[in-house]
Amino acid sequence: MINKIIKKTLVTSISALILVASMVSPSFSASKLKLTMATSGSETDARSVAIREVMFPMISDFADVKVGYNSTMFDQGTELDAISRGNLTMSITSAQELAQFFPEFSIFATGYVHQDAAHQVKVFNNELMDPFKKKVEDELGVKLLSVMYLGKRHVNLRQPKSELTVKTPADLKGVNLRMPGTDAWQYLGKALGASPTPLAFNEVYTALQTGAVDGQDNPLPTVVDKKFYEVTKQIILTSHLVDLNYIAFSKKTWDKLSGEQKMRVQQAADAAASWGRLRQLQLENSLADFVRSKGLEIYEPDSAAFRKHVQKQYVGSEFAKSWPKGVLKKINSLGN
């Protein structure tokens, strides 16, 4: 299945690259647009690399982009506000962050809803997303260009397996698990059975090192990129969230672009997302062995027990009340 997804993604990415390249023309003004992008990710983060190496070159003949990595331009969680105020052009946002403004977005941050990378793309491109996208544009001034695959999130703990073996959510009781600070993230942490602690992403390594938190949750590529394997002892393959990000773009800036420029930006964003998705899938296939070589124990819990427990926490919750009627059923129908 993974190989099928990778092959399909590669074809899509290459096709997008060829299409955009064929559109390049000298008709644009010599005066380039000055764009800005802020992200909490590092320069080597897969999302950062995809946008820098794929998206930006495709629009370089009419736009220059200044990037602030590691939250050096805006603090994590403030980027959408910055775009809305006109102080930032683009960023990489999440369903959890959007849920702070629009609670219905919490459906895309719910455990065990998205099935895999291909399912994410189907959902994002389906008409069911149109009301979500329109609301973000109309009320926040942010255009969601494309969906990026971050990976399957797993629980990563400081304690060795000999001290704490996690098979069911009950085993995470009392575990101080770092989660991002939004309500949607914190609720997911509780649904997993842990005691979630809000903490900025750039503070996680030190918190794990000092014992301020017992663990964190992230996909394997992020664990490796941020070197969390240096300060943890085990990874439980919960796969509790097939995590995503959206490429967020200023609607105000978008409206100023010519028709051809809009098409170029959209195609470039889609190509970057496809390239990044391919890279993440390949990394996930290879990084388990790398992490084991660093001394970490990696194992699967009782996935059925986790899925049942997490979904039960959401049924009838305040988050579920905000979900548009029938949307969850539509999302499920697009899966396998």
PLM-predicted stretches and their roles:
Residues 15, 29-119, 137-138, 143-336:
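N-terminal secretory/targeting leader peptides
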Residues 12-22:
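Bacterial N-terminal signal peptides
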Residues 117-135:
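A gly/proline- and charged-residue-enriched helix-loop-helix capping module
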Residues 2-14:
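Bacterial N-terminal signal peptides that target proteins for export
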Residues 20-21, 49, 129, 189:
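Residues in and immediately flanking transmembrane alpha helices
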Residues 23-29:
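Sec/Tat signal peptide C-region and signal peptidase I cleavage site
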Residues 1-2, 20, 116:
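A general, composition-driven signal for non-globular sequence regions
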